[in-house]
UniProtKB/Swiss-Prot annotation:
It comes from Arabidopsis thaliana (Mouse-ear cress). Intracellular vesicle trafficking and protein transport. It is found in: Cell membrane. Pfam families: Ras. A lipid is attached at C204, C206 (S-geranylgeranyl cysteine). GO terms for molecular function: GTP binding; GTPase activity. The gene is RABG3A. This is Ras-related protein RABG3a.
Amino acid sequence: MATRRRTLLKVIVLGDSGVGKTSLMNQYVHKKFSMQYKATIGADFVTKELQIGEKLVTLQIWDTAGQERFQSLGAAFYRGADCCALVYDVNVLRSFDNLETWHEEFLKQASPSDPKTFPFIVLGNKIDVDGGSSRVVSDKKAADWCASNGNIPYFETSAKDDFNVDEAFLTIAKTALANEHEQDIYFQGIPDAVTENEPKGGGCAC
């Protein structure tokens, strides 16, 4: 009997420092939350297996530092991604305003075959803070931004309260899986694409 193929999906989580990227990942994978803040240095990843329909999927979720000095690490870590999650803090306007920068940075570094259709998801995190009274970014403002950038799926989350975390990452997994499937079809249809894109002087294309 044939062994079922395990699908590995690479997901990149981006956003300003302190928006809760690591906390969301730890809550999703380990069901743990810590009030202590520890900045991510460079990049790290966690994995989680889940079943989507008939397929066994391993999510490889990359946590990258939000500090500008680490953005140069991007190209190596972003390439090969199947989905990108953009995270902001609903209580910090700057983190929301910077979504545009992170969105552009990812597309620039990852160089997906079709930037217009590459799947993103937006997470508005920390909705639990002060019972919501500290909030400065409305759900409408976030939804409008997502709509104007290709109808990106949007979730409001709380890593602390474990609110919408599983739902958000399940959508990420399904979106990444759909993108991987489309890529498979795309590459099967153009078997000569590699030789056509060979840099000049880079070898024989025969």
